[in-house]
């Protein structure tokens, strides 16, 4: 890869200074061209014409300071626009794309030769380096992997010949299809589950896309549209142009409202009115009959489903058959089409889903579906009316300043350079998988991890990847094909992100009203619906549709606040749900992954992404003028990354090794633009924000069975607990009743004994006490004896209650509480009774003594008023003291 800046000749003034200026590019492996001499005026334009037209498949487009090109077969002149094209060289490049070295600088080349400033290129052994995702020219293939890839291709070709796929074997062999190098390699079980989930997603995508096309085709006035075919097409084109104008000139919620208002008069108003969801729900009646799930050996090969073709045939049965002119008619342009011929031709097919039967083409499936529902003539008409598949790739930058980029194109089955990622050169590990991949070559693109043969040389590093290769043989993910080489056949749409704002009570430091911005979900749905209405085939075209969605998933960094993290997750989750609900096969795109592949990871600003987007999509330069348009640039670059765009060979590794980012390169050399090369497309893989492949923990049916088993287990546990409690209650009730009866009987016996033993209180008459009769004296003398007997009875009652409470401690808690309460109450009653009896006897004796002896104060004199009045001599002093 050469960065073309100033052009120079080998002779002239300023050569040494220019060589010193561009010498810093040598460690990066970038071939630079010196500035022109002063005699040429510094802006010399070469008059040489290219000897052969450039090959757009391997073209790198960039903008240099000078609008001139050096002579040679590798470039073409574009002085008006200042477009410079550099063709990468390599053993697998096209013969027309050969490159001539115009100048030799001192650099560390990774190729088979090393150029020095003092002499010609000398042969040098290839340097061994670590493989990175899409870091080499052919999708991550290093020089030491070439024999292995050749052997794998030979094994696959042999299996294809054995399977009878002569058409696939005749296709030109491509290098091993590269897929992302996962951060966490999947196991065999994980690969099987991911494949099953991806197959179900692809089947849903195919059926939902067919239903959406049928919903657009079967509008409220289908009969009128049949009668007015030309006027309806003109109205659709005008509506699409208005949608494009609104998408490019407006922003935010106003753009969403304008899009919704314009699309309400377009054929896609069914999508805005909610009929798309009902159409998707009704799409089950048009899908093919369910087939048994595939085995593990057959999961590596994708198969077709007749859902899209059947829906297309059903739409064609009610709409007029397409004429050749209508079939060749290009779809309406929503936004300025991309002018760079930067794609590779491919022949993708309709959406797939795995089946156990042999795969069939979409035309055969459409013919079979039509034959089952209509006469033979109608079946032939429907089969002839089925057009090539339309592939729609949606890329979303979910940032509030982001955008939605949509790229769609129609396949060309007559292209002689047709080749898919699952062709004869696909890497496999055994003959059965190779035969399955070769048989599936005619069904459409399918991405698999780059696996190596088990018989690879030990030095190639393939032996260490045997486990990963065995697991990757089962992994299949739906992948979009390469866009066509003709840039006029694919369209690019850009839609700004609809944002809503809520005012907060807290004001900013400057006194302004603080607003919290958030994605407007309804506006995002309106934007996506309008984009689909513009990209889906118009009514009258029985064309299958394949949908692929890529959503950037930013990681949550430690320095992010709660509001920032919530806003990011809200937007990302909303777009994932919207794309999935619309029928897209959605995958996560980690920020670090796609920016590393494009050389933007670690960039401080947005100038590098804007420059890359302008160079890659020159037709979108009017909407990429300002720095605030970096969201549109990121969305376009994500779409390009999904279609296989990457840095040139070795440039990304050189930048990382030297600690230089692409934005720093552009800042140091403002007139330098590094172009991108196109490799195999990348599948919409289910990954997290860090590139880890998300694996379903269990299969779908296993999860359902596990949930049902869990519910049954909980119900059984509840019923067994209830039975156990009921049984324990029935056994404890008789024992508790017996204990209660025994306790009551014991309490009654003790109370009766206490009542019989306790003497009754004698009430002395006031006159007898005052007179100091012999009866009062006898009562005072009998007081201590009665007090002793009462204390003995109270002690017996207390001991009986304590023994009774100890016997009940082994019973139920409720019985124990009742028994304890009764015992404590009885103990308190007995103690209170004994104390009252004792105090009365002591008071009587003290009163009698006071009456007889007079003047002697007894302890019980203050408690008995009668004792205080007893003494004639000392009674007065006693009453006064009281």
From Swiss-Prot:
Entry keyword set: Chloroplast, DNA recombination, DNA-binding, Endonuclease, Hydrolase, Magnesium, Manganese, Metal-binding, Nuclease, Plastid, Transit peptide
Cellular compartment(s): Plastid, Chloroplast
Region (Disordered), start-end ranges: 87-148, 323-351, 710-882
Gene Ontology CC: chloroplast
Enzyme Commission number(s) from the entry: 3.1.21.10
Species this protein is from: Chlamydomonas reinhardtii
Enzyme class: hydrolase
Gene that encodes it: MOC1
Amino acid composition bias (Acidic residues), ranges on this chain: 732-743
Biased composition range(s): Low complexity: 112-125, 323-337, 744-758, 769-783, 810-819, 830-844
Ranges annotated as biased composition (Polar residues): 91-111, 134-148
Superkingdom, taxonomy of origin: Eukaryota
Name of the protein in question: Holliday junction resolvase MOC1, chloroplastic
